[in-house]
Amino acid sequence: MIHCRSMDSPIGPLILAGHGSVLTNLQMVDQTYEPSRVGWLPENGAFAEAVSQLDAYFAGELTEFAIELDLCGTEFQQRVWQALLTIPYGETRSYGEIAEQVGAPGAARAVGLANSRNPIAIIVPCHRVIGASGQLIGYGGGLNRKLTLLELEKHQVLTSLTLFD
């Protein structure tokens, strides 16, 4: 049984869904690809930790999530999403770099398609994938949100650096 709840965030309302405390979906309410929500039931408090971690992320206090995920997709999508989880907070990779990482050189467009089907936005950080020349390309939640997330992470990385040790 899939349970869901919404939460407010600096990038707009988010929908969390899953079974037990295991997250299967984290979506922006108006993103371009949304899963069917038929049969989803209100959650019973099981996502309190996920909401707490997301709040801490948006406050700049959390750089790595510790939430159990259940990613459902094709074998290729799974490989791409696992690769996304290796991109450090505050850093970016190109679609081509991810294609190379998953053993599919030249499949940058396929990586983009897998990103567009990422069921767990933000936590599986598809927003950290950019074009080869550094430009922002494609994001199911819109380029403004992608830029906001990248700026949040970059700001936190820059403010945590010390000039002199």
UniProtKB/Swiss-Prot annotation:
The keyword Ubl conjugation does not apply. One of its GO terms (biological process) is methylation. Keywords: Cytoplasm, DNA damage, DNA repair, Methyltransferase, Transferase. GO terms for cellular component: cytoplasm. It is an enzyme of class 2 (transferase). InterPro entries: MethylDNA_cys_MeTrfase_AS (IPR001497), MethylDNA_cys_MeTrfase_DNA-bd (IPR014048), MethylDNA_cys_MeTrfase_DNAb (IPR036217), MethylG_MeTrfase_N (IPR008332), MGMT (IPR023546), MGMT_N_sf (IPR036631), WH-like_DNA-bd_sf (IPR036388). GO terms for molecular function: methylated-DNA-[protein]-cysteine S-methyltransferase activity. Signal peptide: none annotated. It is found in: Cytoplasm. Gene3D superfamilies: Methylated DNA-protein cysteine methyltransferase domain, Winged helix-like DNA-binding domain superfamily/Winged helix DNA-binding domain. It catalyses: a 6-O-methyl-2'-deoxyguanosine in DNA + L-cysteinyl-[protein] = S-methyl-L-cysteinyl-[protein] + a 2'-deoxyguanosine in DNA; a 4-O-methyl-thymidine in DNA + L-cysteinyl-[protein] = a thymidine in DNA + S-methyl-L-cysteinyl-[protein]. This enzyme catalyzes only one turnover and therefore is not strictly catalytic. According to one definition, an enzyme is a biocatalyst that acts repeatedly and over many reaction cycles. Belongs to the MGMT family. This is Methylated-DNA--protein-cysteine methyltransferase.
